[in-house]
Amino acid sequence: DRSWAQFTIRKEAKWHDGQPITVDDVIWSLNTLKEFGHPFYRFYYGDVSSAIKISSDTVKFEFSDSTNRELPLIVGQMPILPKHYWDDKDFTLTTLEPPLSSGPYRIKNFEPGRFITLERVEDYWGINLPVNIGTNNFDNIRIDYYRDETVIREALKSGDIDYREENQAKAWALDYDTPAVAQGRLKKVNLRHYNPTGMQAFVYNTRRPIFQDPRVRKALAYAFDFEWTNKNLFFGQYTRTRSFFSNSDLASRDLPTGLELKILEKYKNKIPESIFTTPYQPPATDSLGWPRDNLTVAQELLKEAGWTINDMTLTNSDGEQLFTFEILLYSEGFERIVLPFARNLKKLGIDVRVRRVDQTQYINRVRNFDYDMIVSGWGSSESPGNEQFGHWSSSAADSPAASNYAGVRDPVIDELISGLVQAKSREELVANTRALDRLLLSGHYVIPQWHLTSQRILYWDKFGLPKITPKSGTSTNLWWF
């Protein structure tokens, strides 16, 4: 009846100190992650009511919601922590002592902020499992950390590092015109993948009064000129994102039909009529850099919402409140992307400030929802589930460190998340996810940015790669010398 799932621990499973992985470790891990772990775990394992020791090698998980068909898989993926290692330690404290683990690699040495070296565990207990055959082929893997992206690229070109996945379009287009690349000694490869690419966007904090009117949020999207940005800053490499589940069959498209339409019609009096009449499309331009028509539309929407321009300044109807907000960043590379957007906003009379802070301050502010707008995103998979509560549910809107960055509070969205979690078939999952996608898009909680359906990788010609690239893309875990 799906109210429980039982697992038997493999007899050969052991920690790196030689002690066996036990049922006690499993139970302790669940309770610790829910109580002291990242808030994500409280949502993810929220329907796991208990873990019970059945025998020395068997554990039973009981579920409070038997309609969540994914729960057995979710608990099957749970990180298992060594109880005996943590018994005399405070799990909530930061430490530089490498924790005990049980995987194919362990930490060999490290220097905080500079590098970490992993060494292969020769007697790794799972080495002969079918899932691991052909993987974990390197004796040592060193991961270097850099503060400056330019220095990383120079380190790669000089041979100090062996592999990099490039994340900047400008660098991919201009920074690797070298003899090593031309001669094929340094491989520069664009590998197609079929992973859902999720949503990267300018994210409104709707907890702020200034962003609580969806007409305002919709208006500001007309100031972002993706076509100009893609042409002039990204060398035409990106595709505009039109869904929170982009690059997958979960993305909403055209108008709702079939089961999706049936689901949405239940909420016909509670959701925008446009969902049934107009497919979502982000504003587009001619890429010439002066989106006059779009800014006119934005101005009209702002006027509908009670904002008008007086002396080149956008104010409310009483002329007492200025429209001003801050875009919070931590990446220097994003400033050149955000500044043209900010210039267009200023043409609407909006006083927008672009502020870049260090990563630690940025993380703390985001965790406490202390921002007006950020650039952020949500990953996606082919099987969305419990994690969607953390992204969009009303209960997550005020949960510190949750991923509901936009502050979404909508009872219909809450119900649609429950619908996709409880889906009994792929058809139901797709229909509920597409319906959720439409609600999120129609709410204008974000200004969608762009995505890439390939991996831009560079590596020195010393590696062997599988002849067939997995649909999910390549991974150095599958490579060899």
Report the location of each language-model feature:
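Ligand-site clamp/hinge motif
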Residues: 6, 10, 93-96, 124-177, ...
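Extracellular/periplasmic solute-recognition and catalytic clefts
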Residues: 50-53, 108-119, 144-208, 215, ...
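Surface-exposed binding/hinge segments that line
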Residues: 8, 14, 42-86, 104-111, ...
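Aromatic- and charge-enriched surface segment that lines or borders ligand/interaction sites
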Residues: 1-39, 54, 60-62, 146, ...
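Gly/Pro-rich hinge or "lid" segments in bacterial periplasmic/extracellular proteins
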Residues: 75-135, 139-140, 147-151, 158, ...
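Detector for C-terminal structural segments
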Residues: 111-116, 223-282, 295-299, 332-343, ...
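Short, well-ordered beta-strand elements
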Residues: 4-7, 26-30, 59-61, 103-106, ...
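A structural "hinge/loop" feature
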Residues: 1, 19, 41, 66, ...
